[in-house]
Regions:
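C-terminal segment of N-terminal export signals and the immediately downstream linker at the start
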Residues: 1-6, 23-36
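N-terminal secretory signal peptides and thylakoid transit peptides that target proteins
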Residues: 1-19
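Intrinsically disordered, low-complexity linker/propeptide segments enriched in Ser/Thr/Gly/Pro
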Residues: 24, 191, 282-283
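Serine-dependent carboxylesterase/thioesterase catalytic core
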Residues: 34-62, 164-271
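Active-site catalytic motif of lipid deacylating hydrolases and related acyltransferases
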Residues: 42-47, 55-58, 73-202
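Lipolytic serine-hydrolase domain surface
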Residues: 43, 77, 82-86, 91, ...
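Signal peptide-proximal N-terminal region
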Residues: 61-72
């Protein structure tokens, strides 16, 4: 009789403990995702991924501290590094920049020239550079103006360099080439997408993409067949509103794993001049755009100038449950 009562008490204690552990586990799960994936932009080749990740996290911590919050060390943070893979593709394809055509006599790549011209024209209109300013750079050249005329494209880039108030012509050229290779060459996209996809699990994950990284993350999230759970996709300085880039992903679609998509940009960031709205990136549900970032970096596009924005830090902190 005594043993029977003791067994029942032990069983009740065990059940109570199990229920309590379940409640605790649910509470922990409800506090927010335990994973954070950070996807960097272009121009990161031959850099130390550990140091890059540390720079991102230090800036995130500063942003959280402004809100009186702390980014806990227990969060599992992934930083998929594709900088060297992209650099190999750049060297393998050897797509000449228009400045290379001028200085080295490189062969023109018509497909890239059209892509670059469309990007440059988008940047020109968005930054307020006038036709007269471009004409001044083109000078007395009698060749017909158009996307297949590399001299005309160079004139637009020089005008952007002088009057655009943001990125240099060299940076715009390199950006256009890198995005061109990623969006138009299947092997390049597949390799880079796989690097980022390898950092994802089916655990709830906040995902942050900057510049080209926001394009890569979008590509992965819309094509991955796993049961991913992304309560927040945060894009910073995202160029998906540029038609030449957007058209590479038609038909456009909202990534199924994403619960909320928050797109933050500086209106003087030449790469991200267009919000991801109905006019520039029509998807359902609509993307929430935030245009009040005052990016403190020289070209208004740097990641540090985005991550320390109070509203960006707020959304990220809320999603992480901190």
């Amino acid at each position: 009789m005594g043993h029977s009562l003791l067994d029942r008490r032990s069983l009740l204690t065990g059940v109570t403990a199990s229920v309590a552990m379940g409640i605790i586990s649910a509470a922990v799960g409800a506090t927010g995702p335990l994973r954070l994936v950070l996807v960097h932009g272009r121009g990161q080749q031959r850099l130390d991924p550990t140091e890059l990740k540390s720079n991102w996290l230090n800036t995130l911590r500063r942003g959280a501290q402004k809100l009186g919050r702390t980014l806990p060390d227990t969060i599992d943070v992934a930083f998929p590094y594709y900088g060297d893979a992209l650099d190999r593709s750049i060297r393998n394809y050897n797509v000449p920049l228009t400045s290379d055509i001028e200085t080295r006599g490189s062969k023109v790549d018509d497909e890239f020239l059209v892509f670059q011209a469309e990007c440059a024209e988008t940047f020109r209109k968005g930054s307020g550079v006038t036709d007269a300013q471009v004409d001044s750079e083109y000078g007395a050249n009698t060749n017909p103006k158009g996307p297949l005329n590399w001299e005309w494209v160079q004139a637009i880039l020089r005008a952007l360099d002088k009057y655009g108030g943001g990125m240099s012509s060299a940076a715009i050229e390199s950006f256009s080439r890198d995005v061109f290779l990623y969006t138009t060459r299947a092997d390049v996209r597949e390799e880079i997408d796989q690097i980022v996809a390898n950092s994802l699990t089916e655990q709830p994950t906040v995902m942050v993409g900057h510049s080209l990284g926001s394009v890569v993350a979008y590509s992965v999230l819309r094509s991955d067949r796993r049961s991913l759970r992304i309560p927040l996709y945060l894009t910073l300085g995202c160029p998906l509103g540029i038609r030449a880039i957007r058209d590479q992903f038609r038909p456009l679609q909202y990534p199924l794993p994403v619960k909320e998509w928050f797109n933050a940009f500086d209106t003087h960031d030449i790469v991200a001049l267009h919000p991801l709205d109905r006019a520039n990136f029509p998807v359902t549900p609509e993307i929430e755009n935030y245009a009040a970032v005052k990016n403190s970096t020289g070209n208004r596009h740097g990641i540090v100038g985005y991550l320390d924005d109070p509203q960006v830090a707020q959304r990220l902190s809320d999603a992480l449950g901190i």
